[in-house]
Amino acid sequence: MSYSVLEALRNNPDYVKKVLTARRLDTSLVDKFLELDKKWRQLKKEVDELRHVYNQLSKEGAKAPPERRREIVEKARELAAKLENLEKEVEKIEREREDLLWSFPNLIHDSVPICPEGVDSIPVRYGGVVKVAKDAVGTLKDVEYVIVDKLPIGHADMAEVVLGMVDTLKAGEVAGSRFYYLLDDLVWLDFALAMYAMDRLAQKGFRPIIPPYMLKFDVIKRVLDFDTFRDAIYKIEGEDLYLIATAEHGIAAYLYKRELVEDELPLLFVGWSPCFRKEAGAGSRDLKGIFRVHIFHKVEQFVFSLPEDSWRWHEEITKNTEELIKDLGLPYRVVNICAHDLGAPAAKKYDIEVWYPAQSMYRELASCSNVTDWQSYRLGIRVTRKGMRREFVHTLNCTGLATTRTITAILENFQREDGVVEIPKVLRPYLEPIKAAPKDYIYPKKRS
């Protein structure tokens, strides 16, 4: 089976146009591609036919008497020149066709919502109890809540002013905006969150992995929509290397150009890495604190799956992250991302959002995507099925925990009025062995 987008373009172009319309993209790409594809197939047929004639002439020339051989050789020489020119034309058209094919986003699953302007996601389910002020209750729907007289302090002020364990001012002076110094007990909390997520997921059969933090251009362009994200990722000056924006990129590339057999799948990985992001489109959003920053640590689930199993795995990895967040004691919701906001690689994406009581709103903490064969086609990762049928594998990714963002959620949901932050119980076993680490509570740092 060939690449699903290519199959759909050839066999059901109207469906692809519907997908592009749902994604709010230009549908004229379909007709442009079909024209190129038709031309490429016609030329390729001509090349194959001409090569067959050339091969026949070569065989005939080898057996022909000397007086006929010269004539045959001359014909073969003319055919070879024509064949060479035609092959160059085929290569040129093929490159144009391939470039255009790469510009197509993934197809979308039937359950992906097509939404009106101003709506980016549809809530699927809720977990936990949110703290909310009385005057904000009307904004909540299908949510279990408790009314509080006083809302907690926002995570940015809590981390920097009350606890004194984040310093964005000094980081801004020496590195620029959206950088930070993480200090004291929040450092241990960052480590504990990563170990908690890695341990839980490893127990579920995910293989721990730390990927390279940089990838070559020829590789990174295959794992993400490079034209869209060119300005969002960092390039190493003077090197053919880009910093990864998530462990997903490096893990996907781990099987670059791999040929698998059916019994090897699924392959489950849980990766940890720093993530480097320019946040070029963020503007003035979340300038305070460590919610939206240029570098952070993240645990990532990644699955290489048989095509028929990928939708089951999509639900599975989403539930894995739900469990991590639920067991931390953070109120959350799962939302189904609208077609226009999916991003090119995903056929469907869930976001898991956590309630921030100081802001009285849910904020994204994790994303879980089924990328189907969009990445594997570009990376050349195939599986040979029984009967020797070859297919592209499906790839899926899902945040385990992004540690700094999870810290911000803990600071708002677990703080007391005296400025003390309770450490979620599930994290305490990961802090117990470390003598210098906090165990039950994080106390404001005493000012001298």
Curated annotation (Swiss-Prot):
This is Serine--tRNA ligase. GO terms for molecular function: ATP binding; serine-tRNA ligase activity. It comes from Pyrobaculum islandicum (strain DSM 4184 / JCM 9189 / GEO3). Consists of two distinct domains, a catalytic core and a N-terminal extension that is involved in tRNA binding. PROSITE patterns: AA_TRNA_LIGASE_II (PS50862). CDD domains: SerRS_core. It catalyses: tRNA(Ser) + L-serine + ATP = L-seryl-tRNA(Ser) + AMP + diphosphate + H(+); tRNA(Sec) + L-serine + ATP = L-seryl-tRNA(Sec) + AMP + diphosphate + H(+). The keyword Glycoprotein does not apply. Its main location: cytoplasm. Keywords: Aminoacyl-tRNA synthetase, ATP-binding, Cytoplasm, Ligase, Nucleotide-binding, Protein biosynthesis. Pathway: Aminoacyl-tRNA biosynthesis; selenocysteinyl-tRNA(Sec) biosynthesis; L-seryl-tRNA(Sec) from L-serine and tRNA(Sec): step 1/1. Catalyzes the attachment of serine to tRNA(Ser). Is also able to aminoacylate tRNA(Sec) with serine, to form the misacylated tRNA L-seryl-tRNA(Sec), which will be further converted into selenocysteinyl-tRNA(Sec). ATP binds at residues 277-279, 293, 364-367. Homodimer. The tRNA molecule binds across the dimer. Coiled coil: none annotated. Belongs to the class-II aminoacyl-tRNA synthetase family. Type-1 seryl-tRNA synthetase subfamily. InterPro entries: aa-tRNA-synt_IIb, aa-tRNA-synth_II, aa-tRNA-synth_II/BPL/LPL, Ser-tRNA-ligase_type_1, Ser-tRNA-synth_1_N, SerRS_1_N_sf, SerRS_core, tRNA-bd_arm. Its EC number is 6.1.1.11. GO terms for cellular component: cytoplasm. PANTHER family: SERYL-TRNA SYNTHETASE (PTHR11778). It comes from the Archaea. L-serine binds at residues 246-248, 300, 399. GO terms for biological process: selenocysteine biosynthetic process; seryl-tRNA aminoacylation.
